[in-house]
Structure formats: C-alpha cells, structure tokens
C-alpha cells in the first residue's frame, strides 16, 4: 500500500492522535474508525483494501466523499480562483469588462496517484466579467479547460507547485480580433 492511500493517511492521523492524547495506537485507530462511521478499525481496514474509494473512507482520509468534490472545497476553490485571475490577467486587461469570476466549474477527468499523493484534475469552466458601460464590446467571457494538479499534505488539499495549466480556451470576443489568444 502506498504512502498516500486513504488507509495510510488514516494510520498517520491515528499516530498523531495517539501521541497528542497519550493513548495507545490501537485506541486511536478504533477512534478514527468509529468517527468515520465504521463499526471498528478492522471493518475500516477491510473496506479500504477492497473499496479504496468508499465514501466514508474518502471523507475520513481526504475530507471529501469523492475526488471530484475537492476542487469545490473552500480553500482549493479560493486558490483556484486566484491562480486563474493571475493566469488570465493579460487577456482580461484587453477586454472592456471587469469583475471577472469563475462560473460553471466542472471536473471532467480525475486521477489520483497514491504513490505521490497527487490528484490530477481536468476541469472545464467559464471566466466571465461584466461589460463596462460606455465601452465597445470586446468580449466578456472565456471558455476554458485546464489541468489542475492538487496535492494532499497535512490533511489539506493544495494546488501543486507546477500550478494550473490552461489546455484550451475560447472567447466570445470579436472573431476577427486576436487579442484573446492565450
């Protein structure tokens, strides 16, 4: 079993709990299992080996019942929005719009690497602003697909160091203009 499997993450959490509360590791494992809605640690361990993506196990180990939900957790979503703001700042500066935000965020592909604790997610979304009054229309929306690498460290999901990569983009700008090419 790998370092970043759900079961190994829960074992690490149990070690920390045992140390923090001054209890035996077996007691900490039982407490974590019961807190995760399993009857005992043996049940949790058996389920983890047969069904590593079982929702109770996922929630206890990764904070979400499905990997697709990770992008919507508050910390990750804020990180994602900030990264998109930065990536698209030049393109946004060329529009006659402001107040851009992410809309219709949808994970389209999700893969978790238990060896590295790396969740590779492909997402589709729009990035939309509001037309500034008294300015010519030059586009207010970008339609994007991006790769979002996330790592799970210290019971938190973070955007990995390599950051978000935009893999496709389109805009509702004038098709004769080339300002929106990313």
Predicted regions and their residues:
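C-terminal alpha-helical interaction appendages
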Residues: 1-72
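Cystatin/cathelin-like cysteine-protease inhibitor module
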Residues: 50-182
């Amino acid at each position: 079993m790998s370092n970043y499997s759900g079961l190994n993450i829960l074992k690490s959490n149990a070690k920390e709990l045992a140390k923090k509360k001054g209890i035996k590791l077996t007691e900490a494992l039982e407490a974590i299992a019961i807190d995760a809605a399993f009857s005992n640690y043996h049940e949790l361990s058996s389920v983890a080996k047969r069904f590593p993506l079982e929702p109770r196990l996922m929630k206890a180990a990764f904070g979400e019942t499905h990997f697709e939900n990770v992008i919507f957790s508050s910390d990750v979503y804020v990180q994602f929005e900030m990264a998109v703001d930065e990536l698209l700042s030049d393109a946004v500066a060329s529009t006659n719009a402001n107040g851009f935000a992410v809309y219709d965020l949808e994970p389209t592909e999700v893969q978790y690497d238990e060896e590295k604790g790396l969740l590779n997610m492909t997402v589709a979304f729009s990035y939309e602003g509001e037309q500034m009054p008294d300015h010519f229309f030059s586009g207010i929306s970008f339609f994007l697909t991006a790769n979002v690498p996330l790592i799970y460290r210290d019971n938190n999901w973070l955007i990995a160091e390599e950051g978000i990569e935009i893999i496709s983009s389109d805009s509702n700008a004038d098709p004769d203009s080339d300002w929106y090419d990313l």
